[in-house]
UniProtKB/Swiss-Prot annotation:
Changing V146E: In e270; axon outgrowth, pioneering and pathfinding defects; mechanosensory defects. Residues 100-159 bind DNA. It holds the Pfam family Homeodomain. One of its GO terms (molecular function) is RNA polymerase II transcription regulatory region sequence-specific DNA binding. GO terms for biological process: axon development; axon guidance; larval locomotory behavior; neuron differentiation; neuron fate specification; positive regulation of transcription by RNA polymerase II; regulation of gene expression; regulation of transcription by RNA polymerase II. The keyword Transcription applies. Expressed in 40 neurons located in the head, which can be divided into 15 anatomically distinct classes; unc-42-expressing neurons are unrelated by lineage but are synaptically interconnected. This is Homeobox protein unc-42. Keywords: DNA-binding, Homeobox, Nucleus, Transcription, Transcription regulation. Belongs to the paired homeobox family. Probable transcription factor. Required for initial outgrowth and pathfinding of axon growth cones along the ventral nerve cord (VNC). Involved in specifying neuron identity, in concert with nuclear hormone receptor family member fax-1, or with transcription factors unc-3, cfi-1, or hlh-34, perhaps acting via positive feedforward loops. Establishes electrically- and chemically-interconnected neuron circuits, acting by modulating the expression of neurotransmitter pathway genes, neurotransmitter receptors, neuropeptides, and neuropeptide receptors. It is found in: Nucleus.
Amino acid sequence: MSDNLLNGANGASTVSQFQEKVKDLGVSLHDFTAYYPSSLDTVSASLRPISDPSSDGAFKKIKTEGLGGSVFGSSIAGVTNTPARLCSLERPESERLNSRRRHRTTFTQEQLQELDAAFQKSHYPDIYVREELARITKLNEARIQVWFQNRRAKHRKHEKQLNKAINPPHSFLSNPANTLMRQGMYPAALNRDGFWYQSYQRPMPYPTASPSYSNSFTNPIANFGHSITSFQADDEFYQKSLALRMTTTPSAATAATSLANINYQQTQPSEASTNPPSI
């Protein structure tokens, strides 16, 4: 009888202590809008009686093992059973794989014709054109914008392939500009390379110049002016090349001939003075 009275007194004291602890906890958390316990240990510590754990009390049945089936118990085991996770686990595997795939729009032939006609007019349609296409094709405007982006990328790829087919990569010697640099501007080299001059049916003779020399230096361009005007070239390229050859090559010959004439005139008086005429 005395043991029962002692157990009842211990239970009453435990309840009173728990009520005081809850009251103190409510006062301390009065200024906070929300309180989230960090772990299950904090919650279990707030609900565990202060008395000896071996004693029989009113809260003896509150144990950590009893929470194994709850959300807190599953979080202790390392598995977080959130509602989204539970729903995903309940769905079959085929539905989960389909949800991960991108949604592809299948266009009809009439829709593709309308979109291609608009693309031929403008590769970058404005908002009004897209709205009109959405009304005609019964498509979403975002789908139309994505279709134009893919169509522009396909068009650029097609242009690159076409340019590679028209202009294949050549070597250094097969490049026309490099061939022109290699062959120079002399007629012998021009006659050996028939690639550039297949369109000309008659040969292009080199102009012969016969300048008149005098005692003074003369301008080589003036000496060859008559031959340049009489020569009828079929292309501006030949005129420039001939003018370049005539201004560079004959100038040295003209200067050498003029110097030879001057030296010849200077030697004639000396010979006349050394050999007096016989009477």
